Swiss-Prot record:
Gene Ontology MF terms in the entry: chromatin binding; histone H3K27 trimethyltransferase activity
E.C. code: 2.1.1.356
Matching Pfam families: Ezh2_MCSS, EZH2_WD-Binding, PRC2_HTH_1, preSET_CXC, SET
Domain CXC: 504-606
SUPFAM superfamilies: SET domain (SSF82199)
Organism for this UniProt entry: Pongo abelii
Residues spanned by motif Nuclear localization signal: 491-496
Subunit-structure text: Component of the PRC2/EED-EZH1 complex, which includes EED, EZH1, SUZ12, RBBP4 and AEBP2. The PRC2/EED-EZH1 is less abundant than the PRC2/EED-EZH2 complex, has weak methyltransferase activity and compacts chromatin in the absence of the methyltransferase cofactor S-adenosyl-L-methionine (SAM). Interacts with EZHIP; the interaction blocks EZH1 methyltransferase activity.
Residues of the SET domain: 613-728
Region named Disordered: 188-231, 378-421
PANTHER family named among the record's database cross-references: HISTONE-LYSINE N-METHYLTRANSFERASE E(Z), HISTONE-LYSINE N-METHYLTRANSFERASE EZH1
CDD domains attached to this UniProt entry: SANT, SET_EZH1
This protein's name: Histone-lysine N-methyltransferase EZH1
């Protein structure tokens, strides 16, 4: 009689039952382990408390209780009551005192906890309701209806109730591994059952085979199975995905299992991971691999690593900066300088911007190479220098550090063959050992400094510039030049400032006439075509900023201002466009100067410099807490920035319903995409109350590509005054929220 085979792997229903049973078993096991751990901790802590209590009791027994000296009875007063103070200790005598009542102390206004911030902090949307809001001890019918509507806004997802909803459980990594391994055992047993059945049939049909051979074959197969762990069947991941759809598709789960099992090895490095350059296992790798983590985590808009304000980092800036910062010095830096080698100084001077001469004169060039002999080192070649050489011949030698700091990938380079009739020579190289870390650092520095070997040697610190020069020749990097299209862009024609101002006014008027909607700025990335109707900046009616990858001559790119005054009138293009002066664009108004002091000629750069006033927090005369200013300010002067969490409009709608129920909201619209919420995180300006006659006003300003909310003085404010804003309530909300001020106005 044949034993019935278990369900095959094709039966998805069988695997679903197994997934459910194993998951329930693992959950029960986790709960049991958690309970046992909690009990063990409770017993251990209770024993420590008992031990400490016993020690304190022994110490207190050694102390003698001394009674307090009794006070003399006070003479009677006709308006004060007399009270008697008795003690439970026998050593203390009763005392008779006159009872004096204290004056009423005003209660401190209610304040909910919040975290201080000095700049906006972007957070993700909360798709699960973290807790049911508390609406008071008395539950009303309208409160129950509100809670039901609130849960529906989160699609019925409440923290702690995920297990009640089928398929909404997010499995942790540890439980996921245990679940797959447990299901994999059923798969192994199933295959073993099939193999045993087939082997039994084959053994019955082949009785002539000796028993020893069959045992040997089974032993070999068993050793192979035990030595190599089989990867789980695809049906297992499909069953888990069908039971828990919130965890992803089967392919995602398979990749997740593979990553978790590979990470179990403590000595194994993550994929595409380069060893620490300062460690003993440093390797010699290319520049792209060395800078991969820096380019991935670095934000080129705020110049920070792992930025919390820009989730989508700007693409690399491939355009070169005009001003040169790094130049090759024509004189040797020391006795071991590479410029002392024969022909090296002429080569360095060839690419030095200071050695340029005007006119069409002929010049002798000496290029160092390994293909020519020492005798030919003094050979010269005459090359004709044209007008194009005057413009682009030496730009690449003095590269800018900023051009590479904003570049996500290293500057593209191409191997430039040696010009004809140029003879080069290489000095006899000394055997110098280079470690993997030094070679990797050289490749990183060479992408920025190119053939400035003196600067590279100073940065390395372990090699002379002569040794660096010889290694560069060996690496064949000495003739690698940046691509012409990146390092030699077309010359930009000069335009008069009045044309740029007219251009800015035209776009601003277009924005004012079309709509009042403000959209979040995202840099455009289409370097091969101009900005047209498909450009995201044009579509959102934003200017192209310095972070965009369009052509520098783009008509939509904001040019900055050329003001000589304070930039606080509409004559300034930046002020007209409701944006602060950019220190990289506005070079004459003072926005790019005096960063170490608060006194600056430009008055349109206060938010980015953080030139806020000193604010005080105290109980308000209107409602709750209020914000007071410590120093006097003039009209239209910057007071503070309204900071908080940067959330989406959908998240603001969900939070706003709860805030409206509490009759306290700190939401502030930033643009059509984001809202600033200062409820959980913010600064002291969040306590500024509403008034129909405010002394401050808020304005959304574009600051270096980011919309930020600035609070400015609407009139001259004296020190110690409370700050008020116009929340722009509707007529019904104004009667509900500002009753104190309304009664004051009537009186």
């Amino acid at each position: 009689m044949e034993i019935p085979n278990p369900p095959t792997s094709k039966c998805i229903t069988y695997w679903k039952r197994k997934v459910k049973s194993e998951y329930m078993r693992l959950r029960q096991l986790k709960r049991l382990q958690a309970n046992m751990g909690a009990k063990a901790l409770y017993v251990a802590n209770f024993a420590k408390v008992q031990e400490k209590t016993q020690i304190l009791n022994e110490e207190w027994k050694k102390l003698r209780v001394q009674p307090v000296q009794s006070m003399k009875p006070v003479c009677g007063h006709p308006f004060l009551k007399k009270c008697t103070i008795e003690s439970i200790f026998p050593g203390f005598a009763s005392q008779h005192m006159l009872m004096r009542s204290l004056n009423t102390v005003a209660l401190v206004p209610i304040m909910y906890s919040w975290s201080p911030l000095q700049q906006n902090f972007m957070v993700e949307d909360e798709t699960v309701l973290c807790n049911i809001p508390y609406m008071g001890d008395e539950v009303k019918e309208e409160d129950e209806t509100f809670i039901e509507e609130l849960i529906n806004n989160y699609d019925g997802k409440v923290h702690g109730e995920e297990e009640m909803i089928p398929g909404s459980v997010l499995i942790s990594d540890a439980v996921f591994l245990e679940l797959v391994d447990a299901l994999n055992q059923y798969s192994d047993e199933e295959e073993e059952g099939h193999n045993d059945t087939s082997d039994g049939k084959q053994d019955d049909s082949k009785e002539d085979l000796p028993v020893t051979r069959k045992r040997k074959r089974h032993a070999i197969e068993g050793n192979k199975k035990s030595s190599k762990k089989q990867f789980p069947n695809d049906m297992i991941f499909s069953a888990i995905a069908s039971m828990f759809p919130e965890n992803g598709v089967p392919d995602d789960m398979k990749e997740r299992y593979r990553e978790l099992t590979e990470m179990s090895d403590p000595n194994a490095l993550p994929p595409q991971c380069t060893p620490n350059i300062d460690g003993p296992n440093a390797k010699s790798v290319q520049r792209e691999q060395s800078l991969h983590s820096f380019h991935t985590l670095f934000c080129r808009r705020c110049f920070k690593y792992d930025c919390f304000l820009h989730p989508f980092h700007a693409t690399p800036n491939v355009y070169k900066r005009k001003n040169k910062e790094i130049k090759i010095e024509p004189e040797p830096c020391g006795t071991d300088c590479f410029l002392l080698l024969e022909g090296a100084k002429e080569y360095a001077m060839l690419h030095n911007p200071r050695s340029k001469c005007s006119g069409r004169r002929r010049r002798r060039h000496h290029i160092v190479s390994a293909s020519c002999s020492n005798a030919s080192a003094s050979a010269v070649a005459e090359t004709k220098e044209g007008d194009s050489d005057r413009d682009t011949g030496n730009d690449w030698a003095s590269s800018s550090s900023e051009a590479n700091s904003r570049c996500q990938t290293p500057t593209k380079q191409k191997a430039s063959p040696a010009p004809p009739q140029l003879c080069v020579v290489e000095a006899p190289s000394e055997p110098v050992e280079w470690t993997g870390a030094e070679e990797s650092l050289f490749r990183v520095f060479h992408g920025t400094y190119f053939n400035n070997f003196c600067s590279i040697a100073r940065l390395l610190g372990t090699k002379t510039c002569k040794q660096v020069f010889q290694f560069a020749v060996k690496e064949s990097l000495i003739l690698k030049l940046p691509t012409d299209e990146l390092m030699n862009p077309s010359q930009k024609k000069k335009r008069k400032h009045r044309l740029w101002a007219a251009h800015c006014r035209k776009i601003q008027l277009k924005k004012d006439n079309s709509s009042t909607q403000v959209y979040n700025y995202q840099p455009c990335d289409h370097p091969d075509r101009p900005c047209d109707s498909t450009c995201p900046c044009i579509m959102t009616q934003n200017f192209c900023e310095k972070f965009c990858q369009c052509n520098p001559d783009c008509q939509n790119r904001f040019p900055g201002c050329r003001c000589k005054t304070q930039c606080n009138t509409k004559q300034c293009p930046c002020y007209l466009a409701v944006r602060e002066c950019d220190p990289d664009l506005c070079l004459t108004c003072g926005a790019s100067e005096h960063w170490d002091c608060k006194v600056v000629s430009c008055k349109n750069c206060s938010i980015q410099r953080g030139l806020k006033k000193h604010l005080l927090l105290a109980p308000s005369d209107v409602a709750g807490w209020g914000t007071f200013i410590k120093e006097s300010v003039q009209k239209n002067e910057f007071i503070s920035e309204y900071c908080g969490e940067l959330i989406s409009q959908d998240e603001a709608d969900r939070r706003g319903k709860v805030y409206d129920k509490y009759m306290s909201s700190f939401l502030f619209n930033l643009n059509n995409d984001f809202v600033v919420d200062a409820t959980r995180k913010g600064n002291k300006i969040r306590f500024a109350n509403h008034s129909v006659n405010p002394n401050c006003y808020a304005k959304v300003v574009m600051v270096n590509g980011d919309h930020r909310i600035g609070i400015f003085a609407k009139r001259a404010i004296q020190a110690g005054e409370e700050l008020f804003l116009d929340y722009r309530y509707s007529q019904a909300d104004a009667l509900k929220y500002v009753g104190i001020e309304r009664e004051t106005d009537v009186l």
